[in-house]
Amino acid sequence: MMYSKLLTLTTLLLPTALALPSLVERACDYTCGSNCYSSSDVSTAQAAGYQLHEDGETVGSNSYPHKYNNYEGFDFSVSSPYYEWPILSSGDVYSGGSPGADRVVFNENNQLAGVITHTGASGNNFVECT
């Protein structure tokens, strides 16, 4: 009897467990190279960068957040000036050290301009994440 209940429970839960990877894939709102970010990841990174910008503080040897000049000519839907801030594939908020390849770009009004990456770009340029 107990074995039968356990088998039934396992049979019911197994399809749900197998479906979980597809749920994770659907949470990918931005793809930068092979890195996947949810809107929540982007919002968290943006909030951290904007708070430092507002406080007049920076972190890391490249002094993030710093002005982003948009030399690539991206057609952002929000007005400049723009600032760039690292978004880390680990999910951690950047606090110094290697910034990785990916950035959130926001403006003076804390509006998200876009998510960009050095991955797949030539030299020190950026390409837009999809």
UniProtKB/Swiss-Prot annotation:
Group of enzyme by EC: lyase
Keyword annotations: Disulfide bond, Endonuclease, Hydrolase, Lyase, Nuclease, Signal
Extent of the signal sequence: 1-26
Pfam families: Ribonuclease
Molecular-function annotations in GO: lyase activity; ribonuclease T1 activity; RNA binding; RNA endonuclease activity
Cellular component terms per the entry's GO annotation: cell septum; hyphal tip
Domain of life of the source: Eukaryota
Location of the active site: 66, 84, 118
The UniProt record lists the keyword Transcription regulation: no
Disulfide bonds: 28-36, 32-129
Subunit (UniProt): Monomer.
Family as reported in the entry's similarity comment: Belongs to the ribonuclease N1/T1 family.
Protein name: Guanyl-specific ribonuclease T1
Organism: Aspergillus oryzae (strain ATCC 42149 / RIB 40) (Yellow koji mold)
Source species taxonomy: Eukaryota, Fungi, Dikarya, Ascomycota, Pezizomycotina
